[in-house]
Amino acid sequence: MSGRTARRRVLRVTVPAADPGGASGPARVTASARADLLAAEEPLGIRVDGTALTMTMRTPGDDVELAAGFLVGEAIVRGRDDITAMKVCDGTTCGHLDHSDDEIGNIVDIALAPGVEVTAGARRSFMTTSACGVCGKTSIDDICVLPQAPLSADTTVFEPAVIAALPDRLREAQRVFSSTGGLHAAGLFTASGDLLVVREDVGRHNAVDKIVGWALLNAKLPLAGCALLVSGRASFELVQKAVLAGIPLLAAVSAPSSLAAELADEAGLTLIGFLRGPSMNVYTGTQRLSA
């Protein structure tokens, strides 16, 4: 399996700014060949007990976390005890590993504990792109009746000034983005603004799955009292993942969708959008923000 980045030769074209003096004649366009660093994107197959569950396009790295977090977001597992073994495969051979070890392939196979089952509705035989998972696959009613929801019991209060500072802290921790400019990120923070973990990926939902998987594998679920920040927008699926991980606050630098706001409201999640500079829009769960 390759790394998180790949180098590629590109043609750099520069168009000069218009001459404010109105000089006549065509502008001179310059071009030069150079090497550029790109964010890697490869398929990852997720299997449960040897049976294919889904395939997603992701940035390689933290694949076991991604697979484990995906199972949490699909309400298949709730804690570390629901998983008995994890294997990473290269397509022909598989090796058992601790989740902290390096991955060796593009398939993750997870063995579930006795009594933990994958429902027929959760099984997928199609490709999930890096831009979005299967948004809205699970209905709001289905999610809100799960034991993980609603989140109303989590009465953590967050300071608006602390929330406003999170985007800068997330950007400082985005090591691969700083070299490629091509990755989304998700960061998990305490209510006091301390960064617990950050993950980067070509897909926002993958980055969130990696964080949730990290929490599951380290026996930290549910993530009560935490805030999750994502780059880009907040979709229904990201709200679903936050709710099922027990995260009481989800913030995004862009807008949420209408269905995301509806689910957040029903599940008791504080949903924040347009978190930029000193301002933010609070769509649901305003009681968790101090006056």
Where are the language model's segments positioned?
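A conserved acidic, glycine/proline-rich C-terminal tail/linker
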Residues: 246-258
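C-terminal binding/interaction regions
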Residues: 255, 259-291
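Intrinsically disordered, low-complexity regions enriched in acidic/Ser/Thr/Pro/Gln residues
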Residues: 1-186, 190-191, 195-198
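Generic hydrophobic/aromatic pocket-lining and core-packing "Φ" positions
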Residues: 208, 239, 260-261
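Short, structured coil segments at secondary-structure junctions
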Residues: 245-246, 267
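Helix-rich terminal scaffold detector
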Residues: 235-237, 250
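Structural detector of well-ordered beta-strand residues that form the stable sheet scaffold
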Residues: 229, 250-251, 272
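Glycine- and Gly-Pro-enriched alpha-helical subdomains that act as flexible
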Residues: 176-232, 244
